[in-house]
Amino acid sequence: MVDFLPKVTEINPPSEGNDGEDNIKPLSSGSEQRPLKEEGQQGGRRHHRRLSSMHEYFDPFSNAEVYYGPITDPRKQSKIHRLNRTRTMSVFNKVSDFKNGMKDYTLKRRGSEDDSFLSSQGNRRFYIDNVDLALDELLASEDTDKNHQITIEDTGPKVIKVGTANSNGFKHVNVRGTYMLSNLLQELTIAKSFGRHQIFLDEARINENPVDRLSRLITTQFWTSLTRRVDLYNIAEIARDSKIDTPGAKNPRIYVPYNCPEQYEFYIQASQMNPSLKLEVEYLPKDITAEYVKSLNDTPGLLALAMEEHVNPSTGERSLVGYPYAVPGGRFNELYGWDSYLMALGLIESNKVDVARGMVEHFIFEIDHYSKILNANRSYYLCRSQPPFLTDMALLVFEKIGGKNNPNAIQLLKRAFRAAIKEYKEVWMSSPRLDSLTGLSCYHSDGIGIPPETEPDHFDTILLPYAEKYNVTLEKLRYLYNEGMIKEPKLDAFFLHDRAVRESGHDTTYRFEGVCAYLATIDLNSLLYKYEKDIAFVIKEYFGNEYKDENDGTVTDSEHWEELAELRKTRINKYMWDEDSGFFFYYNTKLKCRTSYESATTFWSLWAGLATEEQAKITVEKALPQLEMLGGLVACTEKSRGPISIDRPIRQWDYPFGWAPHQILAWKGLSAYGYQQVATRLAYRWLYMITKSFVDYNGMVVEKYDVTRGTDPHRVDAEYGNQGADFKGVATEGFGWVNTSYLLGLKYMNNHARRALAACSPPLPFFNSLKPSEKKLYYL
């Protein structure tokens, strides 16, 4: 039996006139060769105990917790364990001696994986002796732009030699190409995070079909990384806020509704358990006004969410624990409004209904205690809502947890719809959001001053003329304006509309700038139409066709809500539908005129089911060609966005960017009206773009994409950049609604399309290669 550890080798960049073979050298172990026995292990032979093969070898695509867990660590296995007898592994994992012996062939820099006769179809297993050193030398060789990622923009040799497990690391094979090398970097980074110093690594894990790899990571890793659940030990960390940098924001802080004493005591206990965390706990008043919310800007905090009682099965001790929820990712580390709905779709698809159900519970809690579904659960969002999706979300969770056959599911559905009806009446059908003349609703949040969660310089171009007018610095002007010490009606109007834009979820876009609070939009009114239809259905099916509102005492039946839906549909057609263009436009309630901004939100009318068959046909024929790009639907047309300049910078919710919510709702809406082939075509475009970025850019999955770029669609230079792009070594979260879009988009793909995506076949060449009968599947 060997008594030392094998080594990994790398290839250095070739010198002139040398293609690289002479530059191969072993990675140094960083220490003297050392015994492969557990520390403290006694010498001498033990009787061999036969172990099952399942105990020894795992699915190469196991979760990281299993794959890099202690049971696969050679240093933690007994001397008799096969993982600690690497020389004998060839008995179980045969690799051709011919292949292993052929090391004297020329290494070439290629952009693809090694598909030569020396390849073994991903069945090989590697042995890496020193994970830290392997990481350092891999990055030194391949990460030429020094961003801790291996991408197509790096100019390294794109090849490395890795020792095989069967040969105890003495024989080597090549790992080639950006995709495999970046996957190797990711796996080494993950292994290091688990404290591993040595690993066995299946080639199949770094040469995995990229479509399978991404969907697997979303389901098994990304959702886990994005899931939060408040308990006594993590609340201080969850409460921290990277968006606010003021002295009062240094300490984590939690605000609790005035009528939740049990939660208040829970958080006090958490603060006392670890005083060094400096967790501050405060009650909110019964009446929350815009003035009060502004007063919290210097001392922002997390808002309490729904909790349930947990009983320790061992001790019988009772304690509170938060329902689970998912956060979008990046700088967004809270429970967001419409992000949560879109993530719930993916969570349900991934059989993680407990998290989706938890978010329904949180929305019920928010409506009950904060009067609305919040933009997110931070104190500075108390006056601001987001696009309402609760009814559809509750119905999806209801069906997933047993539907009408589960009494608990029925109770959850009823509670969710009581909350949704309250939200409908008190938020969307009340002043200032309801326009009494048209009967349609607008995004129109309350608030005073400058939104504190924005970047410090976000509004500098707007504020600079006022700073010059008062002869003060921008910082001083912000203070004077927020404190009401200067009065500027135009600035007040600007921030009124800016807050409305943020409530819309589309922050920011030129279609809303300076007018949002006055616009009756097709997106919001489509959602409210869906609320009315869903409420009518649930009242009929689960309330005995009679619903008594506990807040205002009114009694309604399903017919009442159907009438409301039909009335809204009539008003939408009157004020928004434009047959000539095939778009539902927005209606300016102040100027009493229809806008002409061509937006992808026109497809929300199909998702909600309010468009007629003829309107859907016209939308597909006229509006769709204006919005369909290389990578799917663009947020708006270039014509509507207008010219871009230093004084008129690009906005992230405008051309040329595409967003997952627009794709998801359009796919479902088109399918509902018989245009599933169109949805399939759009889905292929969107999935191609995500897959290409994932393959070429170190497993990157980002918040939004430039749907006009074929090479680097993840590169978005607008406003605060692109969440999900800034990571070292490995991306562990993706981005919430993009994760969902990938899983849902794959449901439209047949095997042929999945193979094309895995090969990163661009949409047009792929579509052109199809047979006439196959083109029909994509409405071509």
Curated annotation (Swiss-Prot):
Phosphoserine carried by residues: 52-53, 112
InterPro entries: 6-hairpin_glycosidase_sf (IPR008928), 6hp_glycosidase-like_sf (IPR012341), Glyco_hydro_37 (IPR001661), Glyco_hydro_37_CS (IPR018232), Trehalase_Ca-bd (IPR011120)
Modified residues (Phosphothreonine): 88
Its EC number(s): 3.2.1.28
Record: active site: 507, 703
GO biological process entries: trehalose catabolic process
GO cellular component: cytoplasm; mitochondrion
Protein name: Probable trehalase
Record organism: Saccharomyces cerevisiae (strain ATCC 204508 / S288c) (Baker's yeast)
Lineage: Eukaryota, Fungi, Dikarya, Ascomycota, Saccharomycotina
